[in-house]
UniProtKB/Swiss-Prot annotation:
The keyword Disulfide bond applies. InterPro entries: Antistasin-like (IPR004094), Hirudin/antistatin (IPR011061). It comes from Hirudo nipponia. SUPFAM superfamilies: Leech antihemostatic proteins (SSF57262). This is Piguamerin.
Length: 48
């Protein structure tokens, strides 16, 4: 997603021209935690 000249990852949304982490809740259990992007944002319901 184009966001103020930057491209947000799938784990981010554009808010006020900035890429921010998606805040979501998932009831899925991941023994190694959830997958994160290069910015430290968690991918929704995606195990690492």
């Amino acid at each position: 997603t184009d966001c103020g000249g930057k491209t947000c990852s799938e784990a981010q949304v554009c808010k006020d021209g900035k890429c921010v982490c998606v805040i979501g809740q998932c009831r899925k259990y991941c023994p190694n935690g959830f997958k994160k992007d290069e910015n430290g944002c968690t991918f929704p319901c995606t195990c690492a």
